[in-house]
Amino acid sequence: MHQAITSAQIAHWFTVGAQFANIRITNEAKKAEAEDNATEVRSDKAFSELSSPEKEKSDDGNQRRKRAQLPTGPGTSPPSLASYEYPILPITKNRQELVSLIENNSVVIIRGATGSGKTTQLPQFILDHYAERNIPCNLVVTQPRKIGATSIARWVARERKCTLGSLVGYQVGLEKMATEHTKLIYVTTGVLLQKLVSSKTLTEYSHIFIDEVHERSEELDFLLLVVRKLLRSNSRYVKVILMSATINCIEFAEYFGSPIRNQMNPAYVFEVEGAPYAVEEYYLDELKTMLPVGVNLDLTLPQDPYITEEMYNVAVSLIQSFDEMEAKDHRRSEQTGSTTHPERGSVLVFLPGLAEIQYMKEALSKLVRKRLQVYPLHSTVTLEEQNGVFLVPVPGYRKIILSTNIAESSVTVPDVKYVIDFCLVRQLACDKETNYRCLRITWASKTSCNQRRGRAGRVSKGFCYRLVTRHFWENEIPNFSIPEMLRSPLASTLLKVKLLDMGDPRSVLSTALTPPILGDIERTVLQLKQIGALSVQSNSQRQFDGDLTFLGRVLAQLPVDLQLGKLIVLGHVFGCLEECLIIAASLSLKSFFAMPSLQQLAGYRSKLSFAQNVPSDFIAYVNAFKAWYTSRAKGELRHPKDELEWGKENCIQIKRIREVAELFEDLKKRVSRFNMHISSSSNPTDYTSLHKQRFILQVVIAGALFPNYFSQGEIDEQLASKELSGNDPKTTILIRNLPPFAFLCYKQLQSLFRQCGQVKSIAFDGSRAYVEFHRSCVRESGVLHEVLLALLRSRHTPALHLQVHHADEVEFHAKGKPIAHLRYTRVNVDVQSHTVSPVGVLSSSVNPEKLPTSRDFVINITEVIDVGHFWGFQTDENSVEKQCQLTAALNMRDLRPLSVSLYPNLLCVAPFKDGQQMAKYYRAKVLHILGSNVEVFFVDFGNTTVVPSSSLRELPSDLMTPAFQAQEFCIARMAPSAQSLILGDRWSSRARNRFKTLTSGRSAIVSLFSILHGVMRVDLHISTETGDVSVADLLVQEGHACHTPESFESQQSHEVLISLYEDMASGRFTPSFASGSLNSRMEEDKQLINQLLLHFCSSGSSAPKCKAVVHGPSSPHKVNFHSMSKVSNFRSVNIERDSINCVMVNENPQDWHERMLVAASVSLSASGSRILLKETSLMPHIHGLPSLVTMLFTPVMELRTNEDRTCFTGALCGLGWNSVSQEAVLPEHDIEIAFDVKFEIEDITEINALRGTVNRLVCDGPNGLLNLSQEKISSLQEEARERLIRLFIKTPSRPECTPVYHDKFKKWNLVDRSQQMEIQEKDDGKSKGVLFQLHPITLLNM
């Protein structure tokens, strides 16, 4: 069993009370060890005199101390400094020397091994030094990660026996445990950086300790730059201490050098030597006796770093050898008289990424007898899985931790004895061509590998095994990693540079420790202009600089990605601030949706459920967060146990959603400083307002994520229909590569998809199978979630396996009967009734006997499912007579109660009462079981009702065979309009009410267009005072619907029906009856199939001995996406598997209009060949929406026209062009759109008007947002919302047009200035730093 961790153990992890070997503190110069490959600076007495400034005068010192004094609140007193006994650590011996060095030098650099006491003890030395002299001080210590800052602060507070937040505290992001009396505070690097950029001085602190400086993150390097600048300008008396276990001392010392006697003198360097326990190092060529036979030591090459299968085997063999090593050590200890039991030391394996962790975990799982407990440690694993790392293993078991570089410094596991290091790391880099981020495997630096080595030897002697040769280590492994500032986007840093206001970005960043490449700075400036944080037209007229806009000032104060910050601001403009704050908080932290490795489908299903039929991860986050927040507010989750249970049921990680809630509150406070507040009326409750708000939110999301736009790829309908053999893509998936006699294992196929949903039928055809899922609700019409779950399964499990009997074995048991023709015969399996039937060669999807006698016939509409979708029955004399006979036959019988338990799709007899008449019984099917009641569907009429379960009766067997009289109908060539899609879930409430008013409970005339998947697609006509009216035309005229083409399969069916009815009318139609011999052959085949099933599926038969690998599931209607910008040309687009849209099925491939997907995160694969999208939203399929959204949110736009300039054909959107070079400013992000609907000058004018309204809510100056009243803000928000809705809902709708791309594709400045009308806002100088410039309009020849 897992054992709990005590507080004493946790304390023990930081400073183990053990003796240290070979401890030496020195200030004498000496050469570094060969393995470190770095020269260390150790200063002698003369160097010390040069490095130390002259002694300050007493009055100067008093001024410094006064500036550092903390404010005190009224009625409170600062906590006392308890006497403290320092633990025996390497750094303790020279306490006074260190204090003296720090007090006499502006900057001191300290290097010491992990566990030497730098972080925990040195700040306390200074704290006690000042306390003894009764001099105020204020110390801040930075840590690169939250977990480090919080845990160290807790440990120091506990050691000093003070309350956390009094004398000692911490601040990590939004979480702060400190008061005005706190004298020692641990913070993350970003927290201190934000404070310094805002205050532009260091004087809030007396001492600044910057820890782990070797990591060289972008934030850390910029912090060093800011500290250095301020130290030399207005904060000369503040002391700065840089600390690390592995640091290039010379580089840092020279960077912080100070001018003394007309020369630059490097900062003072002090080294602490010593480690808790010795750690022995071994390289691959020193492990020959422990390696598997045949391992090639020259496998790893610097040009292509990766892990081969052989190297995985080496690591596994090493782990197995530890038992023998420990047994030898135990025997030696017994000979010396020790009686301790051998303990199996924990193993920490460093791997570059999650894929490698999973591979290694799979390899270790084969060692079933080795008693291993394997824990993955990666940023994506759930918190529950992470906690297992710190648990004490079960006695007799060995703990194996498979970790990325997160365990280098963020997480310390104390009982690690062995470290296995592949010397690889997956580093975030910025692609030079696209500027997208990508994670690439590369060789870790020596400094990182030495940090990893330090993870062992905390409680006993340690061992480090580097899986490279010593020669490779010495000659190929780099000494230091490339600073993040040289390989990552610089957007956040550049905004802080602009806030510092100390010069243009290029000149400021040129003073960094390792200055970024000039081209990277220039590119980032352009991207800030693109996002709207810098003005597109700078007053300085410099292309690579710009004035900070109001949006830029807001973004610089928000601890979120810049696009998420823009989302918050746009959310305020359009009245959906609360939702945007939730999204920004959710996407800034680890996802609170649990996707555990063993329950991926359950997590995906939960996310789909929260999305509420909207294909958007953002909507799922909003709905899940609100569901949790509302439940807590109502007191439903008052007890932690109830909350955890709710989280488990909904696949929500409670701890993480709480963190999102904290960040949500923090962001809400931050934006309130800019006069942005959540409106009390921003939570609509009625159906129309709810969907209107949802649409506005989707547009706002798209606006914030410009230019991360992707369009849905087209599907060849004809090929897709052929591949799916005419089955419904909304309910069916395809399995390939099936073995002979595959119908014998249909139950295995069914069980493979049991987690996805209820399988209705399986159709075998050759080596393929078509698995159809059951539609549990007659009111559903879209792609089933079951289909999406099955397709997702194929992403997690690439290959499916079936246990099958060999074909020869099957034929042998046929006892001489010829069955070779059954190997790949067409077979249909009804899973519900477990009937297996062969399919005839002449089988057709259209049965003439079941067709109406004429294409035009009268029906009675009994149940409206949705607009244009309803159930009814024919009212001709023959049909009515059949219904009467069935009803009479049922109600004359003595019907028996049901003898079986209720289940969905059970055929039965149910009562129905029409008006005042007595209830009668009718044939019915169970839909849903609702406690003691049940919802039933009357199969001869098409309506549904809820009746008591006890009222159901058994359907007599002889009355099961007559065909059901009810028929499902859909109106052909009609789809929802933009108005319906925006104001409802496909259809608005007004459209639904109008359709019900027109059709419910009345007779109507229908004209049969086609029959598709059992549904009659018809033209519906009703009688009015003015005559017969087409319902579709009426709904189109009223703006509820639009005309749309039918699918390829529907068109095919239409042609078949037209031909069939023409033949019937002319007397040429001849019914095709199968011959007696064919019917006999079919019956024989059915008997043979049943005999084979009876033999091979019975419990007494031998188990299958063969394993068949089948391919799938798949769907030819699965959607692919491609980038709308130039940056992703010739790269495939992949959506991350945790996204709702990672598998999408196009249910309307006949609609050729462009559909847009937006993504919050766009990155490159390691190879650079694929674009990876994370957190996506598929926009509603409104014709012209991609063009409208792009034109609305692009910084600059140039309209395209036809040759005669009589109409607009498209637009080029992006950052515009350089007036000198005439080239595009940021060509890789330009988007060329070709209009598929007709846009007029009035539409462009409306876009400009909306951009102007946005500007009035996102600007500085006397008329800026900070100076507006809440009434004025609400008025402008309502104006923006109404303009937005009016832009997308145009009556009459914009006519279709064929897209025409410009012959000078993505070329700017093609419009003559004389043919262009420049649009200028009325600027009285009271609005500054606006977000958008207005688009010029190209004049047309009318």
UniProtKB/Swiss-Prot annotation:
Residue numbers covered by motif DEAH box: 211-214
Residue stretches making up the Tudor domain: 901-962
GO molecular function (one): ATP binding
Domain called Helicase ATP-binding: residue spans: 99-265
Residues annotated for ATP binding in this entry: 112-119
Protein name, per record: ATP-dependent RNA helicase TDRD9
Cellular compartments annotated: Cytoplasm; Nucleus
Residues covered by the Helicase C-terminal domain: 317-503
Species: Danio rerio (Zebrafish)
This protein's UniProt keywords: ATP-binding, Cytoplasm, Developmental protein, Differentiation, Helicase, Hydrolase, Meiosis, Nucleotide-binding, Nucleus, RNA-mediated gene silencing, Spermatogenesis
GO CC terms of this entry: cytoplasm; nucleus; piP-body
InterPro entries: DEAD/DEAH_box_helicase_dom, DNA/RNA_helicase_DEAH_CS, Helicase-assoc_dom, Helicase_ATP-bd, Helicase_C-like, P-loop_NTPase, SNase_OB-fold_sf, Tudor
Domain of life where this protein originates: Eukaryota
GO biological process, alphabetically ordered: cell differentiation; fertilization; male meiosis I; male meiotic nuclear division; piRNA processing; spermatogenesis; transposable element silencing by piRNA-mediated DNA methylation; transposable element silencing by piRNA-mediated heterochromatin formation
Summary of the function given for this chain in its UniProt record: ATP-binding RNA helicase which plays a central role during spermatogenesis by repressing transposable elements and preventing their mobilization, which is essential for the germline integrity. Acts via the piRNA metabolic process, which mediates the repression of transposable elements during meiosis by forming complexes composed of piRNAs and Piwi proteins and governs the methylation and subsequent repression of transposons.
KW Magnesium (keyword) present: no
Lineage of the species this protein comes from: Eukaryota, Metazoa, Chordata, Craniata, Vertebrata
Enzyme class: hydrolase
Gene3D superfamilies: 1.20.120.1080, 2.30.30.140, 2.40.50.90, P-loop containing nucleotide triphosphate hydrolases
SMART domains given in the database record: DEXDc, HA2, HELICc, TUDOR
Region described as Disordered: spans on this chain: 31-81
Chief place where the protein resides: cytoplasm
